[in-house]
Amino acid sequence: MDASKYVRYTPEQVEALERLYYECPKPSSLRRQQLVRECPALANVDPKQIKVWFQNRRCREKQRKESSRLQALNRKLTAMNKLLMEENDRLQKQVSQLVYDHGRHGVAAAGMMRRVPAFPPQAAAAAGHQLATATDTSCESVVTSGHHHQQQQHNVVQPPPRDASPAGLMSIAEETLTEFLSKATGTAVEWLQMPGMKPGPDSIGIIAISHGCAGVAARACGLVGMEPAKVAEILKDRPLWLRDCRSMDVVNVLPAGANGTIELLYMQLYAPTTLAPARDFWLLRYTSILDDGSLVVCERSLSSKQGGPSMPLVQPFIRGEMLPSGFLIRPSDGGGSVIHIVDHMDLEPWSVPEVVRPLYESSAMVAQKISMAALRYLRQVAHEDTRSVITGWGRQPAALRALSQKLTRGFNEALNGLADDGWSVIESDGVDDVCISVNSSKVIGCNATFSSGLPIVSTGVLCAKASMLLQDVSPPSLLQFLREHRSQWADSNLDAFFASAMKPNFCNLPMSRLGGFSGQVILPLAHTFEPEEFLEVIKLGNASNYQDTLVHRDLFLLQMYNGVEESSAGTCSELIFAPIDASFSDDSPLLPSGFRIIPIDSPLDTSSPNCTLDLASTLEAATPRSRISGVNGGGGTCAAAAASSSSKAVMTIAFQFAFDGHLQDSVAAMARQYMRNIISSVQRIAVALSSSRLVPPGAAAAAAQLSPVTPEAATLPRWICQSYRFHFGAELIKSVDANSSNESILKAVWHHPSAILCCSLKAMPVFTFANQSGLDMLETTLVALQDMTLEKVFDDQGRKNLCTELPNIMEQGMACMEGGVCVSSVGRAASYEKAVAWKVVDGDGGGAHCISFMFINWTFL
């Protein structure tokens, strides 16, 4: 048969070819020949033609998949376009309403102004007093702001109280439905697009926050590839997707009309920080189907205003109020559902300290933590249902979500320390704000064993927690640094303690330092559909020499990192981890610990702060060659940082420790000290990171930003120059003298072309300061510099020279060393022409402060 001619295949031949195609879409020549031998029907078909058939078949399959993808994208774009048109119509109605209100108030104001001159002064004052106290809020009698007008109208026009009968509850439900729909699709609330959120085919949806209404409110609209009934089922199960939800109990269920239900719910929400109590809600939820087939679920709080059954207050919860809220779910023409979500609450901000009050007055926070969380969860589940999702370590997506939920819930439970969970507070020593709570009822080993078969024997859990205020530091950047540089804040013996905490005799671990870790390896496990959350396993290489077969050399932590987006308003960033056994089973007990950072003011506030910076923060802690210029490898990070340079955030830290009963006091003391060390390390890192956002480009601008500085930042460069002049009889920097200002000396030392390093006077000297050139030579930052020892910088010959010259430095105060080679923090060699060292003395009593080294004419090899 001529291979160049068209071939018409019989059904038997097509069946044989299709069978092989599904087994192997791209068979080799030998495999095609084998097919011809096995199928006599293909004997008269040229082998080249069979090859062409498979090529065409692969092309058709590729075209089919591409066509299906384009059709799905077209349906999505069509539905999104329809949603945007509806949103545009709603905005036009809102604009028309605002224009009408403005004109009406303008006419009323003009009429009042014409009447004012006719009044004597005393009569005008009396009339003004009457207007201020009048209860009539019509436009002819008083002109008020929209917000005040709404409040007065709300206070005046009160519905009559309803009883707890089915008819009374139905009346409340219908009123709730009307108010919810007016917010979801009408103009009852003035909605503003949330900063950082733009609608589009790849966006999560249309996100808006309220402006000028009572309480805090958020609205989200989006497309989800699931049927309305399944969407409603998921959204009604709030603990499934809202990680701050501690519990939600259905107290009573009543039928309501055709396929409708009324439910009475009691819901508890965890507090996000130690500085505020948790919230609870007593709710009525109404589920019904509208005339157009849309499914609606609306909720509101039951109180004395609406009537209905009451729920006694529960200590220590603060009773919040949910204003008419809910979900409107419509089937989409192209499949799936169009969802409108409204969350409108009054979180009683009066009940929290002023420093965290903005958290409870932030609509952006409600949008991020509730409205957008619901959309993200739905999109994640829909993505997993329609595609074959492959995750690490053989885990199904649902199992990984359960692990994330378990980490967050365990962290929230420890953070809140509620009595009905078994927690009690240990009396503080009064030195700081570290709170220690104990849960003796949390016996972890009741039904659990490790893979070795040994039972878990800890008899209680202790939690050390504290909150601190951060200023001028990006929460995602800070947590990213903590994630990637665990050695900067973690103590190796506590990491070993974490990993061994639930093993037999774990509390016999010595409290002295076990040794350093050789490093950490981050093993990705999974991330959500929108890459705002990562789940990973941290492998810590343990260099400990502790003689215990139960302490593995490799320690494992399950870690969750979320809130990585820097441009989104109200984003909460978290780094939560828990020690895991090598078996990593789904039912293993977890003791989550970690960090949570919540911004507490507007990211659009760009007022210039007046900060006091220490030496490390003054000279910054960014990457080499970017510390003063402000250049950052993160691309848009600098712009976002500049836009929020005066931002504030609350950081909450909580660490859990399993313990045996008789060791509670010693474990509590260890945990308190460990928490203090972590707070100190985090403050040091935060100050260093904040300075890299505050110093603008240009040396002149940098010099202007260096004032005021702390005494250490102001005096150390002066001491370096004075000591150099004393020992060598020459000026280290020709352009400065004893009369120069501290800022000019600091700037000159920072920009000196030679690498200047200072190290401590200890048995194992560590670096405490380096100028720009020194940090470049060592390829490190000021934060990481403090973990580098002097001996690691030199090669073998350099270490020998150092040992020879070190006594001279201590006795004579100075020494000169020949040229040699040093090694950077990443192992790169750098040669220097010569090096000098001198003892730096303080300016008061002449005591030795540190040793300075200067490497002249250095260059990388």
Curated annotation (Swiss-Prot):
Q: Which residues bind DNA?
A: 2-65
Family annotation (CDD domains): bZIP, homeodomain, START_ArGLABRA2_like
Q: Which UniProt keywords apply?
A: Coiled coil, DNA-binding, Homeobox, Nucleus, Transcription, Transcription regulation
State the disulfide connectivity. Answer: none
Q: Which residues form a coiled coil?
A: 57-99
Domain START, residue spans: 162-390
Q: Where does the UniProt entry say this protein principally localizes? A: nucleus
Q: Which domain of life is it from?
A: Eukaryota
Q: Which Pfam families match?
A: Homeodomain, MEKHLA, START
What is the annotated tissue distribution of the protein whose record heads this document?
Expressed in roots, stems and leaf blades.
A Gene Ontology molecular function term for this protein is: DNA-binding transcription factor activity
Q: Which InterPro entries match?
A: HD (IPR001356), HD-Zip_III (IPR044830), Homeodomain-like_sf (IPR009057), MEKHLA (IPR013978), START-like_dom_sf (IPR023393), START_lipid-bd_dom (IPR002913)
What Gene3D superfamilies would the database entry show?
3.30.530.20, Homeodomain-like
Q: Which GO terms describe its cellular component?
A: nucleus
The listed locations are: Nucleus
Protein family membership: Belongs to the HD-ZIP homeobox family. Class III subfamily.
Q: What task does this protein carry out?
A: Probable transcription factor.
PANTHER family, per database record = HOMEOBOX-LEUCINE ZIPPER PROTEIN ATHB-14, HOMEOBOX-LEUCINE ZIPPER PROTEIN ATHB-15
Record-given protein name? Homeobox-leucine zipper protein HOX29
What's the encoding gene here? HOX29
